[in-house]
Amino acid sequence: MSALAELLAREEGVRLLVYDDATGRPVVPGVTMVGHPTIGIGRCLDRKGITAGEALALLENDIAEVRQQVLRSLPWAARLSEARQVVLQAMAFQLGIAGLLKFTGTLAAAQRSDYAAAAAGMLDSLWARQTPARAARMAAMMRAG
């Protein structure tokens, strides 16, 4: 780390959640901002945001975490085709691992290789009613493999 980076980390502090730079309080829904939404070491999100490269780096970190969560929670999923693993990982990314695990019928069907039933279970859900196009694409991938 450069001398400047060390100095700024010390002076600004490292904050891993968005905070109001004027008050130091975390930014949460319903709280009025006084200053600027800031994260990391002084990164003002409303002034600079993040770059596409930074967004992709964050995404890759999130994907690695989701893959581990899915394999830890559903070890049998490692035997699925790559496309079907991607479906489960994408669902866990969107819904959280706890949300994915609520699809008990879908997961049981996928585990026994009944992909039509797994896809049907996906489509018969609140998730599918809330995000119908996405759910239809994911169900088609589950069916086709």
What are these regions (language model features)?
Residues 77-93, 98-101:
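Mid-chain, well-packed structural core segment of small domains
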Residues 30-44:
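Short N-terminal mixed-charge amphipathic segments
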Residues 1-26, 43-48, 52-56, 60-61, ...:
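Long, amphipathic alpha-helical surface segments
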Residues 28-31, 79-80:
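Short, conserved, surface-exposed binding loops centered on an aromatic residue
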Residues 7, 38-40, 87-90, 117:
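Structural recognition of the beta-strand scaffold that forms the well-ordered cores
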Residues 4, 35, 84:
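Residues that flank catalytic or metal-binding motifs in active/ligand-binding sites
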Residues 18, 38, 79, 92-94, ...:
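Residue-level preference for alpha-helix termini and adjacent loops
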